[in-house]
Design a protein with these regions (language model features):
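Bacterial extracytoplasmic/cell-wall-associated proteins, especially those involved in peptidoglycan
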Residues: 2-224
């Protein structure tokens, strides 16, 4: 459909200009509570989501994007990972870790997020396995360019598009994170079943944090 009335729409490439992107609308269906008439059209449903998204992205945010030489799709893609990986209290910290990995001089230029990866064993919240694979009728049927563009363990930088529809807190954190000291220079994070986040700058520190998280998880599972 034609949604050119919304400012953000002009910043989102058409399918022909983004051949590796899975879905154009992904990321822009703003999460909110809505009321619809049951006989309304799909176009009007989508337009309502888009209008709400459009209202969130202010002129100041567009100016900040320009200042950072960042596109709106890049921001929303980053924010979608923040949305999936962090609770609100950790949005800025997780966003900073991802931005550290995306920096030009990063020693770890891949997001390596299990929320969009080839790793089937971690498929509870995995975009490639839960959404893309069913659409194509199974993993083996996914076009190779799509897998390459969304598997964050193989593609450098951001994937070809968002993996969810982030809320405004995740979007703001992705645009201008305010991390704590622990996360400021970190390249890694891991969580435990109690919801604690552990941040690390080096792989050895991260491996130690993984062991700490595993011990917590073992205790939690024992208490069940």
């Amino acid at each position: 459909g034609d949604f050119s009335e919304y400012t953000f729409w002009q910043h989102v490439p058409d399918d022909a200009d983004a051949p590796d992107r899975f879905m154009k609308c992904e990321g822009y269906l703003f999460p909110e509570t809505y009321e619809f008439l049951k006989d309304d059209t799909v176009h009007n449903y989508v337009a309502t989501f888009y209008a709400q998204f459009d209202a969130q992205i202010t002129d100041a945010m567009y100016a900040e994007l320009k200042k950072q030489d960042m596109t709106l799709p890049q921001l929303i893609t980053l924010a979608s990972f923040v949305q999936e990986e962090a609770g609100n209290s950790q949005d800025s910290n997780v966003a900073q870790v991802f931005r550290n990995r995306l920096a030009a001089d990063s020693p770890y230029p891949r997001l390596q997020s299990n929320t969009s990866s080839y790793i089937q064993s971690d498929s509870d919240n995995n975009y490639l396995w839960n959404w893309v694979a069913p659409y194509y009728g199974g993993w083996d049927n996914i076009p190779g360019n799509i897998v390459a563009a969304y598997d964050t363990y193989s593609c450098k930088g951001l994937p070809a598009g968002p993996i969810s529809n982030p809320g405004i807190a995740a979007i703001k954190a992705a645009l201008a994170p305010q991390p704590n000291e622990e996360a400021k220079d970190a390249y890694f994070f891991v969580t435990d079943l109690k919801g604690s986040y552990y941040y690390a700058r080096t792989l050895s520190e991260h491996n130690a944090n993984c062991q700490k998280a595993a011990q917590v998880n073992k205790t939690v599972n024992t208490e069940k």
